[in-house]
Amino acid sequence: MAQKQKCVAMLLAGGKGSRLSALTKNLAKPAVPFGGKYRIIDFTLSNCANSGIETVGILTQYQPLELHNYIGIGNAWDLDRVSGGVTVLPPYAESSGVKWYTGTASAIYQNLNYLSQYEPEYVLILSGDHIYKMDYSKMLDYHIEKEADVSISVIEVPWDEASRFGIMNTNEEMEIVEFEEKPQFPRSNLASMGIYIFNWAILKEYLEMDARNPESSNDFGKDVLPLLLDEGKKLMAYPFEGYWKDVGTVKSLWEANMDLLRDETSLNLNDRDWRIYSVNPNEPPQYIAEKARVEESLINEGCVIEGDVKHSVLFQGVTVEEGSMVIDSVVMPGAKIGKNVVIERAIVGSEMVIEDGTIIRPEKNVDDVVLIAEGK
């Protein structure tokens, strides 16, 4: 029997991320590079480490190899523990054959044995594909104080975007009275962040109930949470007011990277009290040539800059040759940009080679973002 834990985190990291197009052709969405030196999953894992959550199960499925290699034993996030720590949980074969995760609830249900060994009081369920910084221990305190069966972290979203999210309708005490999955005509703009705290006994009971229902799609938002409400369980909304971004599309991924370049951003990567940890690529120092110009940009290790870079994010090992301009763009690891190239409002994928004289910018709508990438 493993050492008993008060709270165990389960991090859902198996999503395909098809809206990110070629960036996720051969890569799980949580492993997509972000912010010049990170992967998307770094934010959730760092939140766990900073919140004192020491036992994390990571549920993977789609294109898991690079993600598994990246996570390793969790030492980058100080989660390489003798008891607990990080455990990668892909689907596995039983006597009846391999059982794939069919939904978010299915993924947790198939790993109830993993949870049971820790005898937790609470289970924190997380998504590995959002950008935010959050102290989960404060949410757990709120959950306990409110004597909730389930607590769901929510954030106010613009009304014209509310129909894209699971929306919570609450009373004055922030108790959830109705849950609507992507409503056409929302009555609230409190969106679910995909962060749940369950009392362990409730989670186990309702996942087993959901698994027995042949009509269920095995999803928390569509099936489990509405059932809990129907049966009178106490669901509380936990309001979150910091930065949070769903980077599920090429444009939203670009926007989140651009947010890092603002003079005042609520997503401060320089906060020494809440560090975002990552695997160190061990590249040499960046080199900025004499005639190069760099403004308002994040430039990681191993970059060689001989041209101009303005308001952009460059990952490790990027080369920008003489005469080239990179403006309002994200250039992912190892990309090579030749001479006299113009790149504007674009994401350039890992290891891409941009030939001399190429011009890359939105052709029709100036608000668009261009993606130049190939699945490896």
From Swiss-Prot:
- Please name the pathway: Glycan biosynthesis; glycogen biosynthesis
Record-linked Gene3D superfamilies: Hexapeptide repeat proteins, Spore Coat Polysaccharide Biosynthesis Protein SpsA, Chain A
Q: What is the catalytic activity of this protein? A: alpha-D-glucose 1-phosphate + ATP + H(+) = ADP-alpha-D-glucose + diphosphate
Residues annotated as binding alpha-D-glucose 1-phosphate: Y101, G166, E181, K182, S192
Could you say which enzyme class this protein belongs to?
A: transferase
Q: Can you name one GO molecular function term for this protein? A: ATP binding
Q: Please state the Enzyme Commission number of this protein.
A: 2.7.7.27
- The yes or no answer to whether the keyword Ribonucleoprotein is present is no
UniProt-listed GO biological process terms: glycogen biosynthetic process
Which keywords belong to this entry? ATP-binding, Carbohydrate metabolism, Glycogen biosynthesis, Glycogen metabolism, Nucleotide-binding, Nucleotidyltransferase, Transferase
Report the HAMAP family cross-referenced here.
GlgC
Give the protein family.
Answer: Belongs to the bacterial/plant glucose-1-phosphate adenylyltransferase family.
Q: What is this protein called?
A: Glucose-1-phosphate adenylyltransferase
Tell me what organism the protein belongs to: Bacillus cereus (strain Q1)
